[in-house]
Amino acid sequence: MPFLFAPAMQAVIPVRDSADFFPVRRVYGAAKNYAPDIATCKEKKGFNPPVFLKSPDCIVPVQDGATYLWPMPPRTSKIVPEFELVACLGKGGRNLTLDQAKDCIWGWCVGYDFTRRLTEKDLPTGGPWDMMKTLDGGAPVSAVRPAQKTDLSNPVAVRLYRNRELVQDASTEFMIASPEELIAQLSCFWELRAGDVIFTGAPVNVPDARIGDVFDGSVEGIGSLKIQIVSENN
């Protein structure tokens, strides 16, 4: 099959402690999926978080111990680095039950869902979130840890540091819709498939980012990821 120009490269994420790579098909995300405390979380059970898609080429795998330098995009008033637990699917389907949804999870990683706050001139009036969510290099992720080697049966800590100061100290216990519930919800609207990646939402009180800021996030038992915001011309 002749191409007019080289096709885009397949987005991939390395598998931890393996020579294999996880091929990315689609990238889904969830918003407003954490409560500030357990009581509020229980009150909101049954709430379906808003969901969105990011382009697969937003995915950037970051090596363990490395700091990902991400340039502030143009025409941006501020950037919000949403640090999240990420589910990676090894199979999919439609209208999945919770048990089926759980069985779809091949592995886990951590990642940042960068969100752009647009200048007032460019802000869409009630339109889609594409300009805010699909950013060049706007979804850096760690290596994927296979689900069979991961225990998420109990809540785990989700922490984010900005310039070595702890700015988020949360737990997956504060998650309103569990990863399985998110997967089941998504499967009602799209046919999920192997290679789909799902950002499960960020804890409340996500900090703003300025040029020069260094963020270091971790999910207990899954991984950590360090980034620095740099100027566009860096």
Each language-model region and where it sits:
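Catalytic-core "active-site belt" of small-molecule-metabolizing enzymes
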Residues: 1-189, 193, 197, 205-234
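Active-site pocket scaffolds in enzymes
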Residues: 201
